[in-house]
Every structure is written in C-alpha cells, then in structure tokens.
Amino acid sequence: MKKESLDFCYDGMFKDKRIDNRATRLLSDITNSGTVTINRCCPTHKERIGAYRMLNNPQCCESALSEALFRSCHDNILSRHVLCIQDTTEFNYNAHIDRIGKDDKGIGPITKDSHAGFFCHPMLVVDPLSHLPLGISALKLWNRDWDKKNRHERGYQHTPMEEKESYRWIECPAKSLFQLPEDTIQTIIADREGDIYQALCIIPNDRTHLLIRSSSNRKLEGEDCLLLERMSSLPIQAEYEIEIRGHDSRKSRTAKIALRFSGLSLARPHTCPSTFRDALSINCIYVVELPQTVPQGEEPIEWRLLTTHSVDTVEQAMECVNWYRCRWFIEELFRVLKSQGLDMETAQLESGSALKKLLLIALPAALRIMAVKLGYDSKNENIQAGLYFSESEQRCMRLLHKTVEGKTIKLKNPYRTYSLPWAAWLIARLGGWAGYESAAKPGYITIKRGMDTFLCKYDMFKMMENEFEQIDKKAPT
C-alpha cells in the first residue's frame, strides 16, 4: 500500500451540496473533538443546529453515507489482495429510550430483549502487509421489531436463508467484492459465527477466498471421525511461540503452539437444504497450545481455521494464521466506536435513523484513531504519517516534539521523522504515556486522549499559521 493520504469527504454524495459540506464538517468536528455528542463536538450553536437538522433530514440518507465509506475504501486500495474482516456488534440505547420512544421504527430489541438499540455488521478492509485499515467495503445496519416472534414461533429451521439475520455473513462478502477494484482479491475473515455451511458453499469465487474459524465439530465425508478428531490425529508440522495478552479469564504468557494442517471434505449437515452440495472440499489449519504453557484452570489457545487458500506448506499455513490474527482489529474498531473512543452509545439523538447516520459519519474518525494505535504497534517506519495526517498537522507535530521529548536518549522519539510510528509516539506521549520502550504499550484510551490533545493544540497552531500568512501578505515588500 502506497498512497499520499487517506483523505475522506462527502463531495458529490448528496443532491444538495450543502449536505455534502455539512457532513464533511461534522466528521471533522467528531475527529477533532473525539466524541460524537453533538453538543460537545460542534464548536458553535449554529453548527450544532445544522448537525441536528442534517441528521434528521431525509435527504441525508444512510445509503449515501454508506456509499461515501465504500468509495473512500475503494480509492485507498492499491494492492492486489486485501483482508476483509466481518463481524457484528450492537449499539445499546436503552438509557435513551424515553427520548427516542419505543414506537421509533429505527430502534428495537437487541441481544437482551428488554434493551433497545440496533445492530451493525461492517466489513473492515485491512492491508495484508502493513496491517493498516483501509476502510469499510460493506456494511449492514438493522434493528429488530418489538413484536418479532421467537425462533420456534417463526419456524426458524424452515425459513429461507435470505430471510434470516445470519444471511449477513453471505450478503456482505458479495457486496464487498462489488466495491473493490476489479483486479483485487479479497480474503473474507470471520469468527465462529461465520461458520455456516451455506456460506462456505456460496461465498468463494475467483476473487474471494475464505478464512473462517470453525465452530462446529463437523462430520467429514467418507470418514468415520469428526473434524476435531481428524485434525488432532495429524502429525505436528511446526511449533512456534506467541505472546498472549492477559485479561479477566486468561493469564499473560508466552504460549507454545503446535501447527497441523490438511485438506478434507465436509459433509452437508442434516439441517442444510439438499439443494446444497453433499460434500465440500476445503483446507483446515489446526493450531493448539501445547500443555506445558497452559496455566492451571485455563483452556488452551485453540483455532480450527477453514480456508479456500492453498495450504501445502508450513509457510502457507503460518501466513493464513497471521492473517486470521488480524480479525482482532474489528473488535478494536468496535471498542473505539464505543467506550474506549467516541462513545457512540452516549449520543443523545431522538431517532434510531439519526443515530445510524451519526454512526456512519463517525466510522472514518474511529478508523483514524485505530490506525494511529496500529501504526505504533507495527513500528514500521516505511509507513508515512501522511497517510493519516496532513502536511500542516505534521508541521505541528514537529514543533510539539520539543514539549514531550526528554533530555535522555530513552525519552527521544526513536522513529524516523514523518513516519507513522513517529507520529503515533507523539500522540501517545500527549495522551499520558510514559515514553519508555520498557513501559506498557499505549492503549486505545491513551491514543484517543492523545489525539484529543493534539487536535486541540493543532487548532491553535493552524490559527497562528493562518494569522502569520495574513501578516506576511500585508507586509511591505
């Protein structure tokens, strides 16, 4: 991926040029303020009124805002292969239901039936080499009806696939391919919820590969064993170590992983219509943590990855494993949109439609925060800061380094000037990170706080820069 910048705007997306300008301005306000709350992100009363009116204007439609996302993603792709990561999240507005009202057609029950909100299923496009986000190539927003019947009442097993919510796992890859450059191949990555036999049959084509984590211990065609038994019986092809970050139910550690892989044939489940093929040939990569590094009381790290990519060598298998590890990025995107970033669930609008449109405008801002964090983590100095920051912003960064660098080498920015890790180091320091390489890596809250601080300082820098330009123009020659 090599491009001068990943700029985003809404030029030409709406019939009314004023909506183009207003949407671009609101995105800028969200990016600069680090929040989607209109009363906090818009600097003046006039801007706030304009934002509310736009979000409630039927001419500012979800389809045009989505198309702007897809157009930007298309323009950012310069490689022949991209990773397309899909997953689902929900936005909970139960705290605001009195303002919105249960009769609003844009809001409905979410996972917890008594809570109100809507669902979002995006396709995040990631460059397979730099591991940086390029944009969103497909997206589905929807809400359930309050009077929707349960699975038993609806006869879920007999409902056509196209009418099920799970059809999103098939629908979005097709829409994603349509939005990509014609010579670009996509690898669809999904967690266990995407392990649907119909999807495994329908999605692959000349430009679409699959890399799905298996959820079912499936039956195999022509064999007396199930998938897990078959993969466990194979000889270990390689062993390697990975660093595991701890959380509530998992300890931090260096895990030793065993790698196995094989081609196999999945048998059609009895719940799948007979119109689908009886057996499906696919490759499986099985990675499991060896017993010696599994802490007592914990389950081992274990992935069974189903893929249409060729897996004949350890190198090919490891490449697929590393691609699948990028699936975590979409979880991080959801966190940036919510409590660790833009606080989308605190937005105080009066309709589900307006909230969905606000989410579509907030996505590019979330991607920028995410890219800065990943830019620091990658430490890849070949990635230019100019991908995500303007020349003026980079000049401001150069000046701000004097305020955050220490006197010792350990507190100097170690990265090449104007590289993305160089910019991310500054942002992290402005967010309160200690700056030492031995310190814990800055997280999203630190990066988001640093972006807020930087953009506040940049506003002053830009104002002074413009003022000096005016003085220079007026100065006698």
Q: Where are each of the predicted segments found?
A:
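Single, function-defining residue in the core of a domain
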Residues: M1-D104, K112-F119, L124-T477
